[in-house]
């Protein structure tokens, strides 16, 4: 079965082995593709790779929180929390002009 997912429906993507799980408000979809593929094909103004295993839709971000001493997590509007690496946090700050 083929599901058409519009960019605005995409909340975030998470890597798991050779697959990427795409999260939308309506459910999860697994795609046999690499994170690098999505990173290069999704619009950089809208999607940021915040961790080696996670790409997030910046329009879905509610806030960025300090998690522990030097770690950050990204809280989405739907309540999901995603860990951000230090490099991912810096990239997110640049893209959001923080």
Name each model-derived stretch.
Residues 1-83:
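Conserved binding/recognition cores within well-folded domains
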Residues 76, 88-98:
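Eukaryotic intrinsically disordered, low-complexity regulatory linkers and tails enriched in Ser/Thr/Pro
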